[in-house]
């Protein structure tokens, strides 16, 4: 039977890119303060948003009224969409193993 550890690995263990390094430098301290459950919810939320924003058939993303009422405004939504289009495989490759690790740990509790 495979043994899993609950010890945390640094984010750059999963993906060591300039974008990940900048993310760690900018938000690492705040992310460390989150509880385990909050980190799991954050990763899940990012993955779901990534899937939703990157779906070209999603009318919600194209809706100007939706975009104008987002927290970050239309420019940020459009910029995020461009980033997601270019980085989707890398982001999913980073987030999905983390979510799977949290799910395994939750199953053992």
Model-derived features with residue positions:
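Short amphipathic alpha-helical interaction elements located at domain edges
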Residues: 1-109
